[in-house]
Each structure stands twice: as C-alpha cells, then as structure tokens.
A protein has these predicted regions:
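Short coil/turn segments at secondary-structure boundaries
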Residues: 41-51, 75-79
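His-Asp-centered metal-binding catalytic motifs of divalent-metal-dependent phosphohydrolases/nucleases
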Residues: 20-45, 56, 87-97, 117
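An active-site-proximal "capping" alpha-helix that borders the catalytic cofactor pocket
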Residues: 2-9, 51-66
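Residues in and immediately flanking transmembrane alpha helices
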Residues: 43-44, 65, 131
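Divalent metal-dependent phosphate-bond-processing catalytic cores, especially two-metal-ion Mg2+/Mn2+ enzymes
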Residues: 4, 8-19, 29, 40, ...
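Residues that form generic nucleotide/phosphate-binding pockets
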Residues: 59, 90, 154
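Acidic/histidine metal-binding catalytic segments
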Residues: 14-25, 67-92, 106-113
Length: 173
C-alpha cells in the first residue's frame, strides 16, 4: 500500500516518470527491515528490538548475516547505484520523529513522500481495525479517556506528540 500511495502522490505532484518509479520503489522497500526484525527478535516493536528503518538499510545495503535464510541486496531491486543514497535516506529516516536538517531538497522530497505514504497506510490500518486491536483497550475505556497535558501542549505548539508523551488512549488520535 505504501508503494501505491507514493506512486499516486508523485504522479499528482507531476514528478518525472523516473522519479515516480523511484518513489514507488522507496515505498516498496521502506519496511524491508521488518522481516529481519521479526526473524531476530520475534517482534515488530522497535522499542523491544532495534529501529526497523535502520535494520532495513542494513539488510539492503550491508552484509547478509550468516544465519539469514536468504541474501537480499538493493541490487535485487535496482541495477544502477546512482540513487542508492536517496533510497538509503528514504528508508533510514521514514520512521524518525524529524528528518535531519541537512538533507538536500530532492532527498527530502523522497523522504517526505515515503513518510506520508506510510502514514496513509497506518491510517488505513487503523480505519479497518477495532480500538482494542490498535490500542489494546476496549471502546468504553477509549471513549472515557481524555487528552493528557503533554498531548495538549504538543497540539498548542503545532508539533507531533512524541511516543513517550502519550499517556492516555485518546493521545493516540
């Protein structure tokens, strides 16, 4: 779904055919680290393992672990290495709270599109799921919850709520 969202947004923004294809590829590969994360730690939670984004970069651009069931490389997906750094950045930073300030404009555009595609997919997943599945609380507990002070402060400051600031089920809206 993320690859499709990246493709659609890139087309809507009038990107070149080559950049549309590259946006699609970045969206496809953004969660490549999830497979290795599940294999090594039996979890999809970064807090209980390591950043799945960093792990994705390791899987695609690094050495294949000796105990890995198969070798995967960025060359399996694209022959020309000219866009490797842009692809690496779009994968590495897609789950970061903020993008690094020093990114060039083109790399930032690709990072933004992958992050936005990922958010669209997360919202689709949430819309198709129950409160209990997503937040591990029943609907009554969710409806009885309120926004915490840190969440209200983040809203007033026009910024995202950090994970460690979320205390109440409502904070996850």
């Amino acid at each position: 779904h993320v690859a499709e969202a990246c493709d659609a947004v890139a087309r809507e923004q009038g990107w070149s055919p080559q950049d549309i294809d590259l946006a699609w590829l970045c969206g496809l590969l953004h969660d490549m680290g999830r497979f290795e994360q599940l294999r090594r730690w039996d979890t999809f939670k970064d807090a209980e393992s390591m950043s799945h984004a960093a792990l994705g970069v390791e899987v695609l651009f690094g050495e294949t672990p000796a105990d890995a069931p198969a070798a995967t490389s960025i060359r399996d997906f694209i022959d020309d290495p000219v866009e490797d750094e842009l692809i690496r950045a779009s994968i590495a930073y897609h789950s970061d709270f903020r993008l690094p300030a020093q990114l060039d404009e083109r790399t930032r555009r690709f990072c933004d599109i992958v992050r936005d595609g990922d958010k669209i997919d997360i919202m689709r997943t949430i819309a198709d799921s129950t409160v209990d599945t997503i937040l591990k609380v029943n609907e009554d507990a969710f409806l009885a919850s309120h926004f915490s002070a840190p969440t209200l402060a983040a809203f007033a400051e026009h910024r995202c709520v950090a994970r460690d600031e979320r205390d109440e089920p409502a904070d996850y809206l």
